[in-house]
């Protein structure tokens, strides 16, 4: 079947799904669909359907919200070529399951499919890390010695793509804050043990 939720509305309500005003019912395709839908409730309120383990929920955004109006910006480390690292990508046929705890799940791990092994070296030490699929990219959830000090305590995200030659570039200058850094409504994945680095990665977004 089609992923997502059903919206029921009268024409007078002015709710639009994928640009079409709803008069009766409309399917709002989830983020797990190749072509996810967008819902427009008003000039400032929009939404989309998030998916998790076969369950769906409507996430709503209001550009007039107090949090957005008072948003002060994002601090980041200066660009550092030191933190552009070339690693090795080894595909795992069929992938493997790795448990990721989430911020609000009270220690319960959710299995994510990790499609390959990423290895790299830093200061003579080899590391093997786990990144799960996120659309067409790989998502690395990591923490380091800056976490809870000069960067966000929960950790940060880095999106990756393997190169055709079997290498993978980890440019930590592109590390970003997770959604839960901006709102308690988000239930972010936490770094598994192998993604908790003992060194400080002074690159990317901080807080």
Where are these regions (language model features)?
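Forkhead-associated
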Residues: 1-32
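Phosphate/adenylate-binding glycine loop and adjacent helical scaffold
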Residues: 21, 39, 43
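Short, isolated positions in well-ordered beta-strands
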Residues: 22, 46-47, 125-129
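A short, sequence-level motif marking secondary-structure junctions
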Residues: 23-34, 51-55, 130-138, 156-157
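Surface-exposed beta-loop interaction hotspot
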Residues: 43-110
């Amino acid at each position: 079947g089609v992923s997502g939720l059903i919206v029921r509305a009268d024409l007078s309500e002015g709710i639009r799904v994928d640009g079409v005003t709803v008069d009766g019912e409309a399917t709002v395709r989830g983020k797990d669909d190749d072509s996810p839908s967008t819902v427009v409730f008003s000039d400032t309120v929009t939404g989309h359907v998030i998916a998790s383990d076969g369950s769906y929920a409507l996430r709503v955004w209001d550009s007039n919200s107090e949090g957005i109006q008072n948003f002060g910006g994002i601090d980041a480390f200066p660009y550092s070529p030191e933190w552009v690292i070339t690693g090795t990508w080894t595909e795992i046929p069929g992938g493997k399951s790795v448990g990721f705890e989430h911020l609000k799940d009270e220690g319960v791990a959710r299995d994510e499919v990790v499609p390959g092994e990423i290895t790299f070296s830093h200061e003579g030490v080899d590391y093997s890390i786990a990144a799960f699929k996120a659309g067409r990219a790989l998502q690395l959830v990591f923490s380091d010695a800056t976490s809870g000090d000069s960067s966000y305590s929960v950790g940060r995200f880095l999106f990756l793509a393997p190169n055709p030659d079997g290498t993978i570039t980890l440019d930590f200058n592109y590390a970003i804050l997770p959604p839960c850094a901006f709102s308690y409504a988000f239930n972010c994945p936490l770094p598994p043990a192998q993604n908790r680095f003992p060194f400080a990665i002074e690159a990317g977004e901080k807080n």
